[in-house]
Amino acid sequence: MKHLSRFLCLLLMLALLLPGALAEAVEQTDDDSEDITEKVGDIFDMYQVGSMVEANGKLYTISYGPTICEYDGENWRIAVAVSSFSDVLRFSEDGSFYSDETSAVLSVDEDGTLLMLYPYSDGVIDLLRVPLDVSDVTRVHSFRLSEDSADEDGSLYCSLQGATLTGDYAYVTAYGLNPEAMYGLNQLFELNLKDGSVRKVTEDYIGVILPLDDTSLIGYYDNRYTGLTDDPLTALVRINRQTGLTDTLCEMESDSSFSGFTMSGTSVVFNDGSQVLRVAAPYDTVETIGYLPPAYVYTNLPGCVSGNSYYTYNYDSGLTSIDLTAPLPATVLRIDSSISWGDAGDLVRQYAKEHPEVGIVYASTSASTAPDYTQHMQSGEALDLYSFYLPGDAFAALRNKGYLAELSGSSDLLAAVTEMFPNLTKQVLVDGHLYALPVEVSTSCWSIDTAVLEDVGLTAEDVPTTYLELLNLIDEWITSYVEDYPEHALMDYPYSLSMQLFSQIMMAQIAECEADGRTLTFTDADFIATLNKLDSMREKLQAYEDQWSDDNNNGYVTYSSNAVIGGSYDTSSEGPLLSSYASIDIHYASNPESTAVPLMLSIQPNHDSSIIGNIRVMAVNRSSKNADAAMNLLTYLAVNRSDYQKSLLSPAYTDNIEDPYYEETKKSHESYIDELTKAMATADDSEKRDYQEAIQNLTDALTRLSPYQYTTENILLYDSQMENVRIIESTVFYGDDNEASTLVKRYMDGNITVDQFVRELTRIVQMMIMENS
């Protein structure tokens, strides 16, 4: 009975959290004789994908389980199911070691059988023979790389970084066997496939390895992340199999990462997430031979050449094949790699797939100031599309000096930006002239938990509307409420409280001046009163912060998720009154269980609140020879945004946003209810109550299920909050050798008073105004 109850509870969790998971489980248990090796599906929906090889004219890869998947050029199927490995894999009863199938490496034996090097965290690597005719998987050898592969507490952590099989030997690089080694320093071992012996060859910053000839290997060398060198090197190196000595063959770009290494004949083929690259004998030059839908690169992801195509897998773009005989595109756009993530990155990949005539390469820049960008835009490393965060000083300076192309020529692009929240676009859309496309917005604000407010006897009238009222509430809580209400914390994660509050007060004052159209000033009475209050609380805030830190380190601090509108949190039955890491978002506005609301704060009483926002914008380098193609890409990004992304940036989109998983989830719930109802009909009377409870819970969940991910009501609430977001334009605290920033440090270090700070800051602002005039 107890076991049945737990089982039904597990089924219910699967039903609510993993649509489709239980249906598959039920389907497979209905008929144990079902040949699951013939199931066809897109296995690259899975997050983890390992080594990839060609055998018998087909492509094989390792996925979670382990599972061997086969691709025949059109469809994927599971060629070797996880159950085939159950008798040969090692399993730790006490959890002292674990396996890592996505670091396993496939090779092909002379008879077409797959060979697999399968690693474990305790330094053991099994050589498995994996037939493709549903015969048993067998263990050929079990290699132990080191007898001493544990740290002081006995836990094991060996991690396989690279491996290759060639002739009678396998070579592997592993990290973690030397507890004193710096990050990236791997040990290279030779495994004798005939007698099962192990020989350490060398220790170096080499990860991926490939066979070169009878005496040498090719390795990917990367010492950039050691922190021990002023001369970072990323290169292909030749490794002597006997001595381990290396010599550099071909240096590669130090700002890039690489993955998908494979041999094609005598050439090394790999990618940087954007380009397919080849290094041919004598291995001294990197050449581009194709372009991928660009994505972020993880070094250990697989690659394989099959026929005329290069196959690679990436977590963001899935499986991609590139015809290596196709001509290279005439236009290649270099764009800022900072947008390779998220929705913008997805749209860039989508554009690349739809426009093979345009190659897209992600590249980075260390520029942060206008002079830095100016120099970069005129160099050989210049980008066609740059990304900027606002607020900041570089974008406005480059815009005003004519370094950014005007984009108003694209009517679709202009229309998309014109309909966005005007408080977000003031710096990119100036007097009808468009200079950039906003692609991302983020905010930071305080929130207050109304449930905690009620618990401690406070009312809506006690909710702060100014920063001075917020400081008074914090002061009162620390003074009076801490002892009276120990079950509630004042706030979540109070790190650097004085500096955090000071920065928010300064930004709010700037935002209010800009919103009012006033000359920037720091002499307003309300501002000075707020700053004086903060100054008087600094020691008290530090003491509270120190006490909170001690409690947190001792495990005494946990929070309820209902108390947070964003940011991080722990979970328990109680929540804090305040969160300093809240944000404005449709997702949080739509959370029906949240008892937290954002605080709309101002400096002046009865003034519109100012929530400080940040936006990422994309702008075209005016000097680019591909400016038109870059503008076409920006137009594509603007027009093809999802409904959710449009709603985030524009008040014009308020329609309900459909949940793409609604029908699947609904069918799954109905299927679970049907299966449980059938099972209940033949269950013992003692079990029926558990079935009824599980069915009722699923029925309730089905009733609550909505076809909409976000409703018009959610979006309108978000829109009303976004009206208070400000992207400040003042650059008083930005730029190198900034005098105002130096002044802030002197004040926060306690070297000057509030009056001295205000007086000096006023002088700096007046000088800036005179210079700009």
Could you describe each region identified by the protein language model?
Residues Y435-V439, S444, L468-N532, D570-L577:
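Extracytoplasmic/periplasmic solute-binding protein
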Residues L390-C445, V597-Q604:
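Hinge/lid segment of periplasmic solute-binding proteins
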Residues Q28-G41, T67-G95, I125-S149, Y183-T202, ...:
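Surface-exposed loop/turn elements that mediate protein-protein interactions on large endomembrane-trafficking
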Residues E24-C69, A163, G176, G207-I209, ...:
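Conserved N-terminal structural module of periplasmic/extracytoplasmic solute-binding proteins
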Residues I474, D516-G566, Y588-Q604:
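Glycine-centered hinge/linker elements that transmit conformational signals in sensory
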Residues S590-E670, K678-A681:
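Extracytoplasmic/periplasmic substrate-recognition and gating elements
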Residues A405-M420, V463, I510-L531, I603-S609:
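Short, solvent-exposed loop/beta-turn-alpha elements that line the ligand-binding surface or hinge
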Residues E675-M770:
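C-terminal capping/gating helix-and-loop segments adjacent to ligand/active sites or protein-protein/ligand interfaces
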